[in-house]
Amino acid sequence: SRCHRWADSPTGGSGPWGAESRAPELANGIEKAGFKIHNILTWKKNNCTPSQFYMKNCEFVIFCRKGKAKYINNIGDSKTVHEFNNISGKKVHPTEKPIELMKFYIENSSEENDTVLDPFMGSGSTGVACVNTFRNFIGFEIDENYFNIATKRIEEAQELNELL
């Protein structure tokens, strides 16, 4: 309920990630919670690994909000498909997002010193991106191992920023 109250902010936006197979269910839940869906944004992965099936070279985020809409910061980058490299090599979380991708969305939809909430923070990429873009961050993760990984990554980003 704390997450729901936070997301209920009159100026808050939301961007839950989901697989294309779950998009209708996710969109339905978002609308039932009273959010207005603005766009479905697509992350096109530039460096996917081939498989026996169609490659999963895209992931989707549903950009939605409650209350008054906030305009994005970089109108020149207002397209709905964005290309970023996937994380190559060993990931610390199965759905880990590149920090540059998260920085892009965070910088485009918030201001410095705003607070970003990630109720499913996984390995903490959103938190690291917030540190690197001077945003406050609140994250939740139910898996203790991933919580510890995320905490360590965010603390390391904070220490690095203090040195710069």
What is each model feature region?
Residues 1-148:
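Core catalytic lobe of class I
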